[in-house]
């Protein structure tokens, strides 16, 4: 008896019960048929594979990095300007909110809104937090870490979003 073995790389496109990009951070960009009916791809043929081109190149998912020296969040917000974004720190959390009112695009009228909340490590220096938006729409929130035993100064405050004219140096997914 022959059994078809699929490489794990294909599982995202082929898995009938694998979550689609429906709940990813695409901020109102269109959906594909397989986002609504993912089981169809596996019923056609076990070897049928949907295109991953857009998913790989334009995932829109945030990335959080925390190493020994710093804490960084990368978030794709290409449909928002700095005026549409609010970044604030409350206790041990950073909250990023984006909203733009209804405006016309190529397909009609659209409005977008998102809210993300991330827990800050306890040793991040909250007085030195910064946030910038690159020319290609990548929001970078970062803060240095301090040695243990030093007070990190937890308070509520807004972090201004500065605009950079160069593209982001964030890794592409």
From Swiss-Prot:
Binding residues for Zn(2+) 1: 100, 102
Residue numbers carrying N-acetylmethionine: 1
Glycoprotein found in the keyword field: yes
Modification after translation: Acetylation at Lys-70 may increase chaperone activity.
Location of region: Disordered: 144-173
Biased composition (Basic and acidic residues): 153-167
Residue span(s) of domain sHSP: 52-162
Residues the record marks as carrying a glycan: 162
GO CC annotation: cytoplasm; nucleus
Modified residues (N6-acetyllysine): 70, 99
Alphabetized UniProt keyword annotations: Acetylation, Chaperone, Cytoplasm, Eye lens protein, Glycoprotein, Metal-binding, Methylation, Nucleus, Phosphoprotein, Zinc
Region (Required for complex formation with BFSP1 and BFSP2): 1-63
Domain of life of the source: Eukaryota
Annotated positions of the Deamidated asparagine modification: 101, 123
One Pfam family recorded for the sequence: Crystallin
Location, primary (coarse class): cytoplasm
Positions carrying Deamidated glutamine: 6, 50, 90
Keyword Acetylation: yes
Family of the protein in this entry: Belongs to the small heat shock protein (HSP20) family.
Role this protein plays: Contributes to the transparency and refractive index of the lens. Acts as a chaperone, preventing aggregation of various proteins under a wide range of stress conditions. Required for the correct formation of lens intermediate filaments as part of a complex composed of BFSP1, BFSP2 and CRYAA.
Protein name: Alpha-crystallin A chain
Chain's gene name: CRYAA
């Amino acid at each position: 008896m022959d059994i078809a073995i699929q490489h794990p790389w294909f599982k995202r496109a082929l898995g009938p019960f694998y979550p689609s990009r429906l709940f990813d951070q695409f901020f109102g960009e269109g959906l594909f048929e397989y986002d609504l009916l993912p089981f169809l791809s596996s019923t056609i043929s076990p070897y049928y594979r949907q295109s991953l081109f857009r998913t790989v190149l334009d995932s829109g998912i945030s990335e959080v990095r925390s190493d020994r020296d710093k804490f960084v969040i990368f978030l794709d917000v290409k449909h928002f300007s700095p005026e549409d974004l609010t970044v604030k720190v409350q206790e041990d959390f950073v909250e990023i909110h984006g909203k733009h009112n209804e405006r016309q695009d190529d397909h009609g009228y659209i409005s977008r809104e998102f809210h993300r909340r991330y827990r800050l490590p306890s040793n991040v220096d909250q007085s030195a937090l910064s946030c910038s938006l690159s020319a290609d729409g990548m929001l970078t929130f970062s803060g240095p870490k301090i040695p243990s035993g030093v007070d990190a100064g937890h308070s509520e405050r807004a972090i201004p979003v500065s605009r950079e004219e160069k593209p982001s140096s964030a890794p592409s997914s």
